[in-house]
Design a protein with these regions (language model features):
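A short, solvent-exposed beta-strand micro-motif common in secreted/extracellular proteins
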Residues: 77-81, 85-98
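Bacterial Sec-dependent N-terminal signal peptides
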Residues: 1-42, 235
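Structured interaction patches on ligand/partner-binding surfaces of diverse proteins
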Residues: 96-121
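Beta-strand-rich modules
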Residues: 200-222
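Short, acidic Ser/Thr/Gly-rich low-complexity loop/linker segments typical of extracellular
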Residues: 60-76
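Short, ordered, surface-exposed loop/turn motifs in non-cytosolic proteins
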Residues: 42-64, 150-154
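Extracellular fibronectin type III
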Residues: 220-235
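Compositionally biased low-complexity segments at domain edges in trafficked proteins
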Residues: 119-152
Length: 235
């Protein structure tokens, strides 16, 4: 009996080792997808931050209702994923501070490039700034490319960081929420005519900061529409 058990153990062990030593026959990711997110007016890259837009991919090659995967935007308004499987996809920019867009169907194989045009909820216009001592003063106006159906405006916030990665996910908190301007109102001619002034006091002397303004509406995602980034050198 002991010999039988020992023999079976050796046989099972050999089978296990053999199965583990076989090479994985599944091919790995073989495709890449990249592109730009463009403002529909300026045709320049959409003002966003890292992860401020999610590019949703649904692979339709095997299912009509696939589980989506997402490519987060980069801070410069581009996106890229180099580890995809070739296939037929529906691609939709989502979860950002822009009016919903229809997805497109596209074959992704090799390196595929596709740009998307977005209409922001808000634009920050007439953006100006000055430094008074250690206080940064930023001024702007707001415009709404589409007024009908625009969600309520929430606020305008300053974002300040010591690198050029600056936005709601990369900011020095003491410079942001205490200095925000609450709006909490529907779009109106009064809002369109107003110049907003945001002050950020007590910047540290001898430091270089990167700053911008962001305005948001009360939609599901509460992402920000941004100004350009400015560089502030505090004497």
């Amino acid at each position: 009996m002991r010999k039988i058990i020992t023999g079976l153990f050796i046989l099972l062990s050999a089978t296990f080792v053999s199965s583990c030593s076989k090479e994985d026959n599944y091919e790995g990711p073989d495709a890449a997808f990249k592109g730009r997110l463009l403002d529909n007016d300026s045709k320049e890259n959409f003002m966003t931050e890292t992860g401020g837009v999610q590019v949703k991919l649904e692979e339709l090659s095997w299912s009509a209702t696939p589980t989506p995967q997402y490519i987060p935007s980069k801070s410069d308004g581009t996106f890229e994923d180099t580890k995809l499987f070739s296939g037929h996809y529906r691609v939709t920019p989502a979860n950002g501070a822009f009016w919903p867009v229809e997805g497109i169907e596209i074959d992704i194989n090799g390196t595929t490039t596709q740009d998307f045009t977005l209409t922001p909820y808000l634009r920050i216009t007439q953006f100006e700034h000055e430094l008074q001592g250690t206080t940064l003063i930023m001024r702007c106006k707001l415009s709404a490319p589409k007024e009908a159906g625009l969600p309520r405006l929430l606020d305008i916030k300053p974002f300040v960081n010591i690198s050029d990665y600056v936005g709601s996910g990369a900011t020095i908190s003491q410079y942001t929420d205490p200095n925000k301007v609450d709006i909490n109102a529907s779009w109106s001619d009064e809002i369109a005519a107003k110049t907003y002034e945001i002050k950020v006091p007590n910047l540290k002397s001898g430091r270089t900061f990167y700053a911008r303004l962001g305005a948001r509406v009360d939609d599901s995602y509460k992402q920000f529409n941004y100004s350009q980034i400015i560089v502030i050198k505090v004497p």
